[in-house]
Regions:
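Conserved helicase motor core of SF1/SF2 NTP-dependent helicases
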Residues: 3, 8-20, 26, 30, ...
Length: 226
């Protein structure tokens, strides 16, 4: 008899009416929105970049180190995440300039790139919060990860082709001046599925001889502005 009573009590506790559930969801949404950090542009270029974030699918930030390229990209991605508009942030970059020792480093591709993505991850931690980054950062094998899994992930630009990203995904591409033309073409085609692509690079720091991916994309956008 007591077992049945306990079972009924447990069911009653689990059964929560739709109104209460909606209130909980709304409270959680408001808490996330309150964590969105305001970012004041430091100059006209940053103001233009932030405006471009709002209605452009592909945004290229080109300039020397220290001008705030990745800071802006990470702030925007974090803002959309906390607003509930995206549920996947992909961090990608080439390993062209990392040297011949890259292949000898133990671990998965994501684990090999992790030390070189720390700057972006630190900025995401700043804008998302430690808990959100810890709970959503994925370091699983790529074959297992890129099914229906969501979260914050690292993937080498060399492996981006063939992976699918929808409109609830933002891709942050760093050091794109060291990507080849074919690699950025593969990256750009991800936009066909609806995701937003934020690319950062410095043309003066390229490890590519001849035209690099960053220069190629800039030339394309001059001819065919979107």
């Amino acid at each position: 008899g007591s077992t049945r009573k306990n079972t009924r009590k447990e069911k009653a506790a689990v059964a929560c009416d739709a109104g209460t559930l909606a209130e909980v969801k709304e409270k959680y949404r408001q808490e996330r929105l309150e964590r969105v950090q305001k970012l004041s542009p430091k100059n006209e270029h940053q103001s233009e970049t932030i405006e471009a974030f709002k209605d452009k699918q592909l945004i290229i930030q080109s300039g020397s180190a220290g001008v705030g390229k990745t800071e802006l990209a990470c702030w925007w991605a974090s803002k959309l995440w906390l607003e509930g508009k995206i549920d996947t942030i992909v961090i990608t970059r080439p390993h062209k300039h990392l040297g011949d020792d890259y292949g000898a480093v133990k671990g998965s591709d994501a684990e090999k790139l992790l030390p070189f993505c720390m700057s972006i991850l630190m900025k995401l931690r700043k804008h998302l919060g430690v808990g959100t980054l810890r709970n959503n950062f994925k370091m699983d094998r790529l074959d297992d990860l890129f099914g229906d899994a969501k979260g914050i992930v690292i993937v080498p630009i060399e492996k981006i082709q063939g992976l699918s990203y929808d409109s609830r995904t933002i891709i942050i591409g760093d050091e794109i001046q060291s990507a080849s033309v074919s690699q950025v073409k593969a990256l750009a085609t991800r936009m066909e599925e609806g995701c937003q692509l934020l690319l950062c690079g410095d043309k003066l720091q390229s490890a590519i001889s001849g035209i690099n991916g960053l220069e190629y994309l800039e030339q394309v956008l001059v001819k065919h502005p979107h």
